Amino acid sequence: EPVFLEAYLPRLRQRPDILLANLALEIQCSRLSHQRFVERTKSYLNNGYQVWWILGHSFLGQRQFSLIEKSCCYYNRKRGVHCWKADLKNQKLYLYHHITETVSGHISFFSSCWTFSGNDLKKIFTNNEIKINQMKKTERLSEDGKKWLARQLIYKQKNTVSIQEQCYLRHKHLLYLSPWIYQNSRFFFYLREQVFLYRMLYEESLKQQKVPDFSSWFCQVKEYKMQWLFPMIEEERVYRQFFDECTHLSSWKI
């Protein structure tokens, strides 16, 4: 299959670093505004291309992900939430997969590595391979959701105060909700503190319907949800999985 370097795509007015058929590979070494990143990504996707963002050495060096780093993430069942990084000096490609985040933003993940030479890059991207023998996991930090919320209220953190206001409108208090609402979530990565609000909305649906319906719950969520920041991840799919998590946790006897 032919490989084109910096091939110009006139309809998109974009020039990917590498073009493999309909796969546009972008190696992002310098900082890029989130708006421009989203524009470029959607331009590829809307014109029938897959886009593979690979971050350079200046990215993914902190315990918390920046907005751009999060937006470069993908999702599938085998790799979970994942993203890519290139070490151009040592000619290695890293996959950070099964990424999770605590409520305070600390990131945990597994990593796998390939050398550039002797490997089919397109196959690596599309086959969902994980090199089990090279997996490494960062320290997972667990946090008490209620204690974290209490600290945010003390410091009058804007998003948390906004959720508290929604509690007040319902004659509730953010720190005195059902215990399951404060449990850990694999959706903090996407939703951060909104997890607690959406769980409260789920519980309201549970009391009204006994068996909550995703569509009616999601209609409620849409009134409060923030802009979706992950152009390579299907939004509704994530919310359906979050809904399933609510169903599971709310059945616990805590």
Language-model-detected regions and their locations in the chain:
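Active-site metal-binding core of divalent-cation-utilizing nuclease and nuclease-like domains
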Residues: 2-24
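Non-catalytic C-terminal interaction segments of nucleic acid-processing enzymes
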Residues: 73-254
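Conserved catalytic cores of phosphodiester-cleaving nucleases, focusing on short active-site segments
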Residues: 16-33, 44
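Short acidic/polar capping segments at secondary-structure boundaries
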Residues: 10, 30-32, 57-60
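Nucleic-acid nuclease catalytic cores
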Residues: 47-81, 88
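Basic, amphipathic alpha-helical patches used to engage nucleic acids or provide basic targeting signals
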Residues: 32-52
